[in-house]
Amino acid sequence: MPILQRASHHELRSAFRALLASERCYHTASVFDPMSARIAADLDFEVGILGGSVASLQVLGAPDFALITLSEFVEQAARIGRVARLPVIADADHGYGNALNVMRTVVELERAGVAALTIEDTLLPAQFGRKSTDLISIEEGVGKILAALEARVDPELSIIARTHAGVLEVDEVIRRTRAYEAAGADGICLVGVKDFAHLEQIAAGLKVPLMLVTYGNPELRDNQRLARLGVRIVVNGHAAYFAAIKATYDCLREQRGAQPCDLNATELTHKYTMPEDYILWAKEFMEVRE
């Protein structure tokens, strides 16, 4: 397909559902603007993802503390949606509020052209006196998934329920994933899976496709084994975005006649977003516990 030729949003959603229905495991391209989306499609990636953390960096220059608003996130998704030739998953965080806010989130992101979106059960934004890793109840999580399904117009839009396997006992992860599957989620997204033994416990009995956020975990690199366990989508992280930060810094530094710098992309991101300040403010003003 020529670079400037676009597919319809419905066609891209159908293409994403075909990935979920396949027996393969696909790795996402991190897309954060129209250019990165075009590059990913031209390099024959089957699917892209707009991460909430990356959107916060790109739009606000801020770390991932649930600071970006729905309208800001949707605007960035729409810019990508105008040119996308591959299905794009939107990391919709907690749906930007309660179940009614989730409905609004689905309406806006569907209109922006995303092929799928994830709704997570993390308690966001961080609440006064609570742990930053706290989750909402299963009942509230189910309500959000039901609300998302009610709000979508195009039945090809995939609603994926996301939970954090790294902060819960495995029995609780199983309860949550089963509940979200029963509510009608088109897929389950898991964060924090430690290894294949952990994944096998969670995946046993699940019929919906799985999406895995691994951040490059070396314990989860066997694509064929992942596929056999029902994993269809893997998010390794957002290396392309951080490489762009590093390249920009190095290029501008060279233009100023400075010597090469040995700061890596992670260190540069910390330097210019100052996450330590946000952590300090959360503790000082909200008594948030890590």
UniProtKB/Swiss-Prot annotation:
Keywords: Decarboxylase, Lyase, Magnesium, Metal-binding
EC number: 4.1.1.112
Family membership noted in the UniProt record: Belongs to the isocitrate lyase/PEP mutase superfamily. Oxaloacetate decarboxylase family.
EC supergroup of this enzyme: lyase
Sites where the protein binds Mg(2+): D91
Known cofactor(s): Mg(2+)
GO MF annotation terms: magnesium ion binding; methylisocitrate lyase activity; oxaloacetate decarboxylase activity
Function recorded in the entry: Catalyzes the decarboxylation of oxaloacetate into pyruvate. Seems to play a role in maintaining cellular concentrations of bicarbonate and pyruvate.
Note accompanying the cofactor annotation: Binds 1 Mg(2+) ion per subunit.
CDD domains documented for this protein: ICL_PEPM (cd00377)
Superkingdom of origin organism: Bacteria
Entries under PANTHER family matching the protein: OXALOACETATE DECARBOXYLASE (PTHR42905:SF3), PHOSPHOENOLPYRUVATE CARBOXYLASE (PTHR42905)
Pfam family, one: PEP_mutase
Residues the record lists as binding substrate: S53, R162, H238
Record-given protein name: Oxaloacetate decarboxylase
GO biological process assignments: oxaloacetate metabolic process; propionate catabolic process, 2-methylcitrate cycle; pyruvate biosynthetic process
